[in-house]
A protein has these predicted regions:
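Intrinsically disordered, low-complexity segments enriched in serine, threonine, and glycine
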Residues: 1-117
């Protein structure tokens, strides 16, 4: 990764937060979710035009939604059936208001590389 790579750990007490992308172009992001309970459902808003819903994930599975590679994996295996969204996540230039329902049910990390046009 380069010096413009930003990993963001989501504190379980937080359900809403902001990400400031200092770049001039949308930056595809990678979301890693490790559930603390089976079959949790999580809804993420602010990283796509429509909400991203994640479901059918078991405790301690590692779910990766990779906007750059356009993949959804659970424990390194295809898991697109657990992903319900029209597009892959990205961080827009400027301030992004992100909201995650049931954030306390998982450990969540969002990563992106700043992009410039």
């Amino acid at each position: 990764m380069n010096e413009n790579y930003y990993p963001i750990e989501i504190n379980e007490a937080e359900g809403s937060f902001t990400i400031v992308n200092g770049g001039t172009a949308p930056a595809p992001c990678k979301i890693t979710i490790i559930p603390k309970v089976d079959f949790m459902t999580l809804t993420i808003t602010g990283l796509s035009d429509t909400p991203i819903e994640v479901s059918r994930v078991k405790t301690n599975d590692i779910l990766v939604i990779d906007g750059e590679a356009r993949q959804v994996l659970i424990n390194d295996k295809d898991a697109f059936s657990s992903y319900n969204a029209w597009e892959f996540p990205k961080v827009q230039p400027g301030v992004n208001k992100i909201s995650i329902t049931n954030a306390s049910q998982a450990t969540i990390q969002i990563e992106y590389d700043t992009r410039y046009i």
